[in-house]
UniProtKB/Swiss-Prot annotation:
Its EC number is 1.14.14.61, 1.14.14.-. It catalyses: 11-hydroxyferruginol + 3 reduced [NADPH--hemoprotein reductase] + 3 O2 = carnosate + 3 oxidized [NADPH--hemoprotein reductase] + 4 H2O + 4 H(+); miltiradiene + 2 reduced [NADPH--hemoprotein reductase] + 2 O2 = miltiradien-20-al + 2 oxidized [NADPH--hemoprotein reductase] + 3 H2O + 2 H(+); ferruginol + 3 reduced [NADPH--hemoprotein reductase] + 3 O2 = pisiferate + 3 oxidized [NADPH--hemoprotein reductase] + 4 H2O + 4 H(+). It comes from Rosmarinus officinalis. The lineage of its organism: Eukaryota, Viridiplantae, Streptophyta, Embryophyta, Tracheophyta. It is a single-pass membrane protein. This is Carnosic acid synthase. It is found in: Membrane.
Length: 504
């Protein structure tokens, strides 16, 4: 048992033992009082210990016993875990407005981010509606993405050039770091028309610090926090989560603020030439009357985009390469398709994607087998409601266990096997309408950056597979292809994939 749990329990035991004992008895009955069934609860802590280090896997195992709508008591907090497409549809679509309020972890309520971030505002708020409209119409619409296609093509060329340098030197490439650099530079070029990181430089200096900030935020925002289970402990910050997130989030906010300030000064110059980037687009909007957009809102929105865009797509591409190296027959099929369609062309263009069905099937299977967000960002019930005949009290924390849904043998044939072929003759897509595959969420709170992430995932996988064969770094072959992951907002590979590119 971790030290913070021991200390926290010692602090609160005298206060709550008696009052919680009655809940222990009721919790053993499973589903009594109209609540969804769930595992027995211990006094005081409820089901906290059953989360374990990998909550997505622990909760999936519990759901096999207690069903696709399962209740838990996490300290003072009542929670419900959804583990089926039918229940996910009910929560995200049919009763989407009731469950559209995000659950904001205690540690993230820092620097005003929870009052401004689109990810943390209730969907019923005017600010959320405004920011969502900006993202949908100005940043991720088809015309906006078409206008920035050249930026993505250039980043794919840079990724190819870096892999070629590794090939010429006969050295292994850290696939996760290389794709992280690609996505980071893509995001900063798209947002600010600048490049932030260099390939192979994430072990030193500012590149290392930036990666630390992003990785820390995606990890700490997702891990269980005792201050959420017992809110009266939040001011004490027993795990130091608030302190850590204040530092890492503050560092990114300062970086973005400096870039915005530089642009504002440049725009005051009469000779300034507008750039084809999101910052100028949103600054123009902030000067108009249609959106009433503030500089502070732009800053926090960009930080959200950087965190989501840099880490999750890089992690998913790394998992794709792991699976393709584990399955040489699948790699061969993909390379044959790429050769047939692309020929001698080294960089896949987005217009090529529609002619690459096995590539799309491969990406879908990676998103099924390794969903970037194993537990979708939790929602909270804005009012008491009923789901499948069970009462869901107001403020219940709702988890959608995407990882469990994508490993369910009643939904997927051979779910533990990596089989892109399952999607070749299937209409199932990850756009939010097929609830057996919702890695980007669904309904009102579906990830607004999904169109960009989808394009880059397919293009990065195609670029790495079409131009190179791959050999694992000598001496650690068995560890390189292990599927052990690290839980957080994004599911990271525990042991990075390092492989030597060989020019085709």
């Amino acid at each position: 048992m971790q030290l913070f749990i021991i200390l926290s329990l010692a602090f609160i035991a005298a206060w709550v033992v008696y009052s919680r004992w009655s809940e222990y008895s009721r919790g053993r009955q499973g589903g009594s009082g109209g609540l969804p069934p769930g595992p027995p609860r211990l006094p005081i802590i409820g089901n906290i210990l059953q989360l374990g280090r990998d909550p997505h896997k622990s909760l999936a195992q519990l759901a096999k016993t207690y069903g696709p709508l399962m209740s838990l008591k996490l300290g003072n907090q009542f929670a419900v875990v959804v583990s089926s497409p039918e229940m996910a549809r009910e929560i995200l679509q049919k009763q989407g407005l009731i469950f559209s309020k995000p659950f904001t972890p205690s540690a993230v309520r820092v620097l005003g981010h929870n009052d401004i971030s689109m990810n943390m505002l209730p969907a019923s708020s005017d600010r959320w509606k405004k920011l969502r409209r900006v993202a949908r119409e100005q940043l991720f619409s088809n015309p906006a993405l078409q206008a920035t296609q050249d930026i993505r093509q250039e980043r794919l060329r840079q990724l190819t050039d870096y892999a070629s340098r590794c090939c010429a030197q006969g050295r292994a490439m850290n696939v996760g770091e290389a794709t992280f650099t690609t996505m980071t530079n893509l995001m900063f070029a798209t947002l600010f028309s600048v490049e932030l990181t260099q390939y192979g430089a994430t072990d030193t200096g500012s590149d290392k610090k930036f990666k630390e900030h992003v990785n820390a935020l995606t990890r700490y925002m997702g891990v269980p926090n005792v201050a959420d289970f017992f809110p009266f402990l939040a001011p004490l910050d027993p795990q130091g989560m608030r302190r850590k997130l204040t530092y890492h989030l503050g560092s990114l906010l300062e970086l973005v603020q400096s870039l915005i300030q530089q642009r504002l000064q440049a725009r005051n110059d009469s000779t300034y030439q507008k750039k084809n980037d999101f910052l100028d687009t949103l600054l123009d909007l902030s000067e108009g009357n249609e959106y009433d957009l503030s500089i502070k809102e732009i800053k926090h929105m960009f930080v959200d985009l950087i965190i989501a865009g840099s880490d999750t797509s890089a992690a998913t591409t790394e998992w794709a390469m792991v699976e393709l190296l584990l399955h040489p027959d699948k790699m061969a099929k993909l390379k044959a398709e790429l050769k047939s369609v692309l020929g001698e062309k080294s960089i896949v263009e987005e217009s090529d994607i529609s002619r690459l069905p096995y590539l799309l099937a491969t990406v879908k299977e990676v998103l099924r087998y390794h969903p970037a967000a194993p537990l979708l960002a939790p929602h909270a019930a804005e009012e008491e409601t009923q789901v499948s005949g069970y009462i869901i009290p107001k403020n219940t924390k709702m988890f959608i266990n995407v990882w469990s849904i994508t490993r369910d043998p009643s939904i997927w044939k051979n779910p533990e096997s990596f089989e892109p072929e399952r999607f070749l003759d299937s209409e199932i897509d990850f756009g939010g309408q097929h609830f057996e595959l919702i890695p980007f969420g669904s309904g009102r709170r579906i990830c607004p950056g999904m169109p960009l992430a989808s394009r880059m995932l397919q293009c990065m996988v195609a670029t790495l597979c079409h131009n190179f064969d791959w050999e694992l770094e000598k001496g650690a072959e068995s560890k390189q292809l292990q599927r052990e992951d690290v839980f957080g907002l994004a599911l990271q590979k525990k042991i990075p994939l390092r492989a030597v590119p060989i020019k085709v």
